[in-house]
């Protein structure tokens, strides 16, 4: 399957402002890129690319005052298969977890696990396998928390969402059960499902470490989906903000597109992510 995706965003800036963008496809999908995948700007600006501590591709730019636009459009090869399901995947004792997963057991800015620990253990500790536990948590979040961009608030934590019963894409509770969980952001189009009439946005989901590997779960949609294109992974949304402006800014435009492509694109010579100039 070939998927075409991209974005076009613009900011109004009252003064020259440093910006970090996290909008490039994650390096783990580099070999799947067929065309494009290079952030462009208007006016043309020098950009510097680097990888952060989580392995995400980031772009630094000093944007001038006024209207500044950024965009990218690319084609990516995908298996066309839904998210993997493995009912037998077990939860690992903490002492058996790989060192690199332990970070994703800890509380973080939006995952205030210490406030949710008692509820999580009282509600989910009697369940059997790791898969059953995680799916039960997703079922709870899906049924008890109302999703909507109108509920977005930049200081709402997992505990706040739990109490208010509204929110956007955030993960919680898995870490309270000693299951490593990391936050992912990326593209997820309406492939294999009825089209959503709402304007398209970037999506978010979680990956949990059970059965010796990372599996994808999505409490918002709560079903295996086709065509996820990960951009970034981290502890929570604070680690994977698509843009961070070090000064006043106003979002002037925001468009995202993701769709299955029938036409085969011209393949890029190396099939890998191009460096940002």
State where each predicted segment sits.
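Intrinsically disordered, low-complexity N-terminal segments that are enriched in acidic
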Residues: 1-89
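Coil-to-beta-strand transition motifs
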Residues: 2, 212-214
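Active-site neighborhood of thiol-dependent amide/isopeptide-bond enzymes
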Residues: 9, 130-133, 140-204, 225-227, ...
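Conserved hydrophobic/aromatic beta-strand scaffold that supports enzyme active sites
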Residues: 71-73, 205, 230
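Acidic low-complexity segments
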Residues: 73, 78-148, 156-163
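Catalytic Cys-His active-site segments of thiol-dependent hydrolases/isopeptidases
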Residues: 214-234
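Alpha-helical and coiled-coil interaction segments, frequently adjacent to or embedded
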Residues: 269, 274-277
């Amino acid at each position: 399957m070939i998927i075409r995706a991209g974005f076009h965003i613009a900011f109004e800036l009252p003064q020259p402002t440093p910006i970090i963008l996290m909008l490039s496809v994650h390096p783990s999908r580099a070999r799947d890129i067929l065309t494009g995948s290079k952030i462009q700007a208007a006016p043309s600006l020098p950009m510097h690319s680097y990888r952060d501590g989580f392995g995400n591709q980031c772009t630094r730019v000093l944007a001038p005052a006024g209207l500044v636009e950024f965009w990218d459009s690319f084609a990516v090869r995908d298996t066309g298969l839904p998210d993997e399901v493995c009912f037998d995947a077990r939860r690992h004792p903490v002492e058996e977890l790989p060192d690199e997963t332990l970070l994703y057991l800890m509380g973080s800015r939006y995952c205030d696990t210490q406030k949710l620990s008692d509820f999580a253990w009282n509600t989910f500790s009697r369940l059997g396998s790791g898969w059953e536990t995680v799916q039960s948590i997703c079922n709870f979040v899906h049924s008890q928390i109302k999703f909507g961009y109108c509920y977005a608030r930049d200081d709402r934590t997992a505990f706040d969402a739990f109490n208010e019963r509204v929110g956007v894409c955030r993960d919680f509770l898995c870490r309270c059960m000693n299951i490593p969980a990391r936050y992912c952001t990326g593209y997820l189009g309406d492939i294999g499902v009825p089209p959503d009439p709402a304007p398209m946005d970037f999506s978010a989901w979680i990956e949990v470490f059970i059965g010796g590997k990372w599996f994808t779960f999505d409490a918002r949609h709560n079903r295996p989906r086709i065509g996820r294109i990960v951009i970034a992974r981290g502890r929570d949304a604070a680690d994977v903000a698509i843009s961070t402006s070090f000064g006043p800014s106003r979002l002037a435009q925001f468009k995202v597109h993701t769709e299955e492509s029938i036409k085969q694109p011209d393949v890029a010579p190396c099939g890998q992510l191009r460096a940002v100039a």
